[in-house]
UniProtKB/Swiss-Prot annotation:
Part of the ribosomal stalk of the 50S ribosomal subunit. The N-terminus interacts with L11 and the large rRNA to form the base of the stalk. The C-terminus forms an elongated spine to which L12 dimers bind in a sequential fashion forming a multimeric L10(L12)X complex. The keyword GTP-binding does not apply. It comes from Corynebacterium glutamicum (strain ATCC 13032 / DSM 20300 / JCM 1318 / BCRC 11384 / CCUG 27702 / LMG 3730 / NBRC 12168 / NCIMB 10025 / NRRL B-2784 / 534). GO terms for cellular component: ribonucleoprotein complex; ribosome. The keyword Ribonucleoprotein applies. The gene is rplJ. Transmembrane segments: none annotated. Forms part of the ribosomal stalk, playing a central role in the interaction of the ribosome with GTP-bound translation factors. GO terms for biological process: translation. This is Large ribosomal subunit protein uL10. HAMAP family: Ribosomal_uL10 (MF_00362).
Length: 171
């Protein structure tokens, strides 16, 4: 019969995989409890960061349809289940890894695809959703202003021509 603690942990992992689209696997070997607590605080409420047995993570991931993580599940592994903005979380993980050399991002899973550590770090270089939308709005505003100017140009040219003709008649 299976260990009840493992069964409970497996059920919790399955639920987490089911409710998130993005997962990042990390190696925490060499981190102190204080450093891990600091990381959890930095990640915020949209991320559940927990240590789990590799075997249980493999089973839960496979049952949730998450493929491609098996090779990453070696050694001590902690899993970040991301409910919010993946870019912001990737930035926090990358910064934490730069400050704590013992911390390593192994890879992850996002939108149906397994990710390498390099891809997770590349995501950290992207702008978050809010910044991207602001840039898009700014670009659209500039383009709309140019378009309005182009549409108004022929009308203003006709008006100037009419004024010039009127001035010529009056002279």
């Amino acid at each position: 019969m299976a260990n009840p603690r493992n069964e409970a942990a497996l059920a919790e992992l399955k639920a987490r995989f089911a409710e998130t689209d993005t997962v990042v696997l990390t190696e925490y070997r060499g981190l102190t409890v204080a450093q891990t607590t600091e990381l959890r605080k930095a990640l915020g409420f949209d991320v559940q960061y927990s240590v789990a047995k590799n075997t249980l993570v493999k089973i839960a991931a496979n049952e949730a349809g998450v493929e491609g993580l098996d090779d990453l599940l070696t050694g001590p592994t902690a899993v970040a289940f991301i409910k919010g903005e993946a870019v912001d979380t990737a930035k926090v993980l990358k910064k934490f890894g730069e400050e704590n050399k013992a911390f390593v991002v192994k890879g992850g899973y996002m939108d149906g695809n397994a990710l390498t550590a390099e891809q997770v770090n590349a995501i950290a270089e992207l702008d978050n959703r809010e910044t991207t939308l602001a840039k898009l709005a700014g670009a659209m505003k500039g383009s709309l202003a140019k378009a309005a100017g182009l549409f108004n140009a022929p009308a203003s040219q006709v008006a100037r021509l009419a004024v010039a003709l009127q001035d010529k008649k009056d002279a």
